[in-house]
């Protein structure tokens, strides 16, 4: 536990110290920043804000985790577990980096196409499964304390889980500070679970990422001086999925990650309903003012018809939802 605390503090300090230099480099090189193509007018002022800040906190968390674990952990099984989780973080970080690179440096607005991104995500998921999950012999998922054996179909579950939550966190990263603190809340919860289980290797990874993210948040809260970009959000979502698998508590991510589930569900419902009503009535209709869900809240509160919410109000509400959901999971696991 002490080692995790030290690693978290180091990650925080390095991330917080390095981020201003990253931002200054972006500005000095006059690199094109984040582009805004949204109907939320208050976001237009953010155009040009440096992005890809996730590169910094991912490098910091990965480096600190590796250095501390190599010098302090002698158990080869623990080192294999750490390398497994870090591998999926790095792979998805590279995918996100490529997507951001095409948008910013090559001025390709959509970056990777949806098919290209999905293909790379599936390839990364397959590597994670065959190199780190399959050798462990795991082929079942924990469903509220019961082990449901999936056999070979566990492969498809892993792919769905990793790809799904990486994209879900990516959708959540739409307003200042929302994704970074939402992930911190999720990681703190998994840190408690890892501690209770005695999985201090996983706890070390969690601690370093929390520290690095908090260092990043100093520059990502409203008004944001930097965004994490796809390089950060895709990697963080994949990390949460991998941690839930490593701790054998897969089901908990549906509740701990309720914010990501809400954001993704809102997009899926909106698109499906729009297509259905367009086919039936000749014009598409919407359930939400705008998706993902945080934009619906910005434009009119919960009802979508009330007073507009500020980004801080949206953040506070969704962070609160995530915190309550996380407490519920801990209560289910260790109280009831």
Swiss-Prot record:
Its EC number is 2.7.8.13. Its main location: membrane. One of its GO terms (biological process) is peptidoglycan biosynthetic process. Its cofactor is Mg(2+). CDD domains: GT_MraY. Pathway: Cell wall biogenesis; peptidoglycan biosynthesis. Disulfide bonds: none annotated. HAMAP family: MraY. Belongs to the glycosyltransferase 4 family. MraY subfamily. PANTHER family: PHOSPHO-N-ACETYLMURAMOYL-PENTAPEPTIDE-TRANSFERASE, PHOSPHO-N-ACETYLMURAMOYL-PENTAPEPTIDE-TRANSFERASE HOMOLOG. This is Phospho-N-acetylmuramoyl-pentapeptide-transferase. The gene is mraY.
């Amino acid at each position: 536990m002490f080692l995790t605390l030290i690693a978290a503090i180091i990650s925080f300090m390095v991330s917080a110290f390095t981020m201003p230099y990253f931002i200054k480099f972006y500005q000095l090189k006059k690199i094109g920043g984040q582009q805004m193509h949204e109907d939320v007018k208050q976001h237009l002022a953010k155009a040009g804000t440096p992005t890809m800040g996730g590169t910094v906190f991912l490098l910091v968390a990965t480096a600190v985790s590796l250095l501390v674990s190599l010098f302090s952990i002698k158990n080869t099984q623990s080192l294999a577990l750490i390398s497994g989780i870090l591998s999926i973080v790095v792979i998805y970080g590279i995918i996100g980096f490529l997507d951001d690179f095409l948008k910013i440096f090559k001025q390709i607005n959509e970056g990777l196409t949806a098919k290209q991104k999905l293909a790379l995500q599936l390839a990364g998921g397959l590597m994670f499964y065959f190199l780190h999950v399959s050798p462990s012999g795991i082929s079942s998922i924990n469903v509220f304390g019961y082990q449901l054996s999936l056999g070979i179909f566990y492969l498809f579950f892993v792919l769905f889980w990793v790809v799904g939550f990486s994209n879900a966190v990516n959708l959540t990263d739409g307003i200042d500070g929302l994704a970074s603190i939402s992930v911190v809340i999720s990681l703190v919860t998994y840190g408690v679970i890892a501690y209770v289980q005695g999985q201090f290797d996983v706890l070390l990874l969690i601690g370093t990422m929390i520290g690095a993210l908090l260092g990043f948040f100093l520059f990502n809260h409203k008004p944001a001086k930097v965004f994490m970009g796809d390089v950060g959000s895709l990697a963080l979502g994949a990390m949460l999925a991998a941690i839930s698998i490593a701790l054998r508590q897969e089901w908990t991510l549906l509740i701990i990650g309720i914010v990501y589930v809400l954001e993704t569900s809102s997009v899926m419902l909106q698109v499906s309903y729009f297509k259905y009503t367009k086919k039936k009535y000749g014009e598409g209709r919407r359930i939400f003012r705008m998706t993902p869900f945080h934009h619906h809240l910005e434009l009119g509160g919960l009802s979508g018809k009330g007073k507009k919410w500020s980004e801080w109000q949206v953040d506070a509400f969704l962070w609160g939802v995530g915190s309550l959901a996380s407490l519920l999971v801990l209560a289910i696991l260790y109280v009831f």
